[in-house]
Amino acid sequence: MKASIWLGNDKFEIRDVPIPEIMDDQVLVKVKKVGLCGTDVHITQGLFPSTPPKILGHEFSGEIVEVGKNVDNQYIGKRVACNTTSNCGNCHNCNNWTISRCSNEVKSSGAFAEFSVMPLSSAIEIPENMSYEVAAMTEPASCCLSGTEMIDYKNDSKILIIGSGIMGILCLKFVKQKNIGYVVVSEPNPLRRKMALEMGADFVIDPRGENFQEDLEKLRGEYGFDVFIEAVGNPNLLAEGISHLGPRGQALMIGVHPEMSNLAYDLYDLHYKEIRLFGAFGRGDSFSSVPKIIESFGLEKLVTRTFNLDEINKAIDLTAEGNGMKYMISP
């Protein structure tokens, strides 16, 4: 099969490699669509730990074309969203509902390739009318669902989201399903601001605008925001967002921050206002339920452009620039 091998830094090479062998409880998936993720960019920039050479790609969908001997042949031909990790169900973390930190997790083979292998439990059948593009967003959507479910909402909650890239938009869609007050999205990119409005934001503001602080003060009100979601992965934006929370406010880190980064914030204020800070990493147990939930979200409009496998460098560069929404690879 053809695969894009990451060789370190921003170097990729298309190679012919053997199709992965499947174990008895596994399935072989023909990869149809792979989403480019900010983590893929961070890996090429040395901001996220990973060791080359390897096949990257973890947001993907496809069709089951072969099954192991312990898997019923009825699964051949099923259209699936693919979870890149599977948990053991037996370790301390799994038994305490922190399956994203499973001590014995098994990773599927990377998806920047024509085929990928995984346990049957990691291949979730998608709705009949769902496109492979939307199905490939199951992975980031499950991270956002797992994170937003950590929050306690009230029927008058005022929510601030900083960043309306894919993670910000997905968080927006999930919180708008709650019985809440309103959602404010802060985003400098005009295309992404427009997308946030189309996807349900009540207010959208430009942090580079002349009246930004004045507008934000009006929207936060006398007592501050109840919930803040940082969807960029920038420690300075995390600190800024926390400063706009009211007493007992809740902050959710959904953006991936660089390793060894620090939060420059007045800990007295954090303590005095009883702020609750949540780190959200991984998909929890939400992955299998996500395809049906996002079916009605209208996520097709988030796909900016699809590239062939040998155009991966262009797709990585455009993702890093942050001017589009979601770029896809079609192996």
Describe the residue ranges of each PLM region.
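Glycine-rich beta-strand-centered segment in the early N-terminal region that forms part
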Residues: 20-34, 45-92, 127-129
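Short, well-ordered loop/turn sites that connect or cap secondary structure elements
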Residues: 74-75, 153, 245
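NAD(P)H dinucleotide-binding glycine-rich loop of Rossmann-like/cofactor-binding domains
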Residues: 88-162
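Mid-domain Rossmann-like dinucleotide-binding core that forms the NAD(H)/NADP(H) cofactor-binding site
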Residues: 131-209
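Short amphipathic alpha-helix with an adjacent loop that forms part of the alpha/beta core around
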Residues: 211-222
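Short SAM/SAH-binding signature in class I
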Residues: 225-229
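Glycine-rich phosphate-binding loop and adjacent beta-alpha segment
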Residues: 235-296, 331
